[in-house]
Amino acid sequence: MTSVEELRACALLQDCADQLSVLGNIIRPGAETQQRTELHLKTAQLMAGSSLSNFSGELKSQKHFKIQQTLLASDNLAKVQKDRQFVSDVINALLEELQKKNNFQSLFSAVAEERKKKAELLDIINREEEGRRQIKKLQKQLLDIRKEKTEECERLEEEVAILKDQVQDMRVRTNQQGKFVKSCAEQLVYQESKHNSYKENELEDEVKMLQEKIEEEKNVHFETEAFLKQQHANLKQKLQYWIHRYEKDMEEKEQEITALQNKRNSSQTRIQDLSKKCKDMENVVIEDRIEKEHLRAQMEKEQREKNAATKIQAWWRGTLVRKGPRSKKADKSKKKDGKKGKKKRK
């Protein structure tokens, strides 16, 4: 970059920095903001150099229109101030680097940093999607666990009902058997006592044997009933345990879902903020590119005008050089003709 181009670029950047500084001073919350904005913008325009006024006129009008629209809302003042400060820092760093090193490396660094922030934003979005998939997976697991526990509870209830029915059937069967055996024994004793007396002892032994069997059946019945009651108590205890465990698992899963939802909401808020910042940075880069394009066009125009002026000056000098001897000869011939005319008159 030549020294003239460097000076022009520095002047343009200084003009932008001054305007941003003035813009930062005029951003005030309250009823006077809208009235002061136009006055400060006019002051910033008067501070710019006359040589760059035509080039930056369109850009100033666009900024003036955007600022008038944005500053009317009090909620956007902080955001505008932050964006203005970022643009001012980028322009000041670029101006300082241009003056010292005659390059635009800081601008490239700012663009690279914004790209890095955009990559981080995409990473956050990917993590958010992974969190959503994890939530869906946990919800599916919770539904499966709930279904499994419900089926197990129903199965245990069916087993308890079956055991109750078995106990009742055994109790009825035992009572019927006892009554039947007793009636049979009495009938046999009565018949045997009538028909044959010598069989009395045998029948008594048989009655005793039957009574022992009845007692044994009763003992078996009592033991079976106690065993079934114990099994019923154990199953009931297991049922209470599984119900408690089911409620505990449900509470833990709900806490995990709540934590994931809170994390998702926080990530969404951060993503929205980063999206706004990314859009603002893209607008800043676009405006900077437009400024560079305008500066390049202005420099090409000035170079063409300079070349044209040089050609015109060279052509004019050549014309003067060619016409110089001819004008001297014409003056001498005019003088001779004047002398001859005077002699004839005499």
UniProtKB/Swiss-Prot annotation:
Ranges annotated as biased composition (Basic residues): 323-346
Cell wall biogenesis/degradation is among the record's keywords: no
Major localization listed first in the record, in broad terms: cytoplasm
Record key words, sorted: Calmodulin-binding, Cell projection, Cilium, Cytoplasm, Cytoskeleton, Differentiation, Flagellum
Any one of the GO CC terms: sperm flagellum
Summary of the tissues where the protein is detected: Detected in adult testis, and at lower levels in brain, kidney and ovary.
Disruption phenotype: Morpholino knockdown of the protein leads to a severe reduction in the size of the caudal hematopoietic tissue at 72 hpf, a strong reduction in the number of myb-positive hematopoietic stem cells, and results in impaired definitive hematopoiesis. Contrary to wild-type, the expression of monocyte, macrophage and lymphoblast markers is strongly reduced. Likewise, hemoglobin levels are strongly reduced, suggesting impaired erythropoiesis.
InterPro entries from the UniProt entry: IQ_motif_EF-hand-BS, IQCG
Subcellular localization: Cytoplasm; Cell projection, Cilium, Flagellum; Cell projection, Cilium; Cytoplasm, Cytoskeleton
MF GO annotations: calmodulin binding
Superkingdom field: Eukaryota
Protein family per UniProt: Belongs to the DRC9 family.
Identification of the protein by name: Dynein regulatory complex protein 9
UniProt organism field: Danio rerio (Zebrafish)
Annotated gene: iqcg
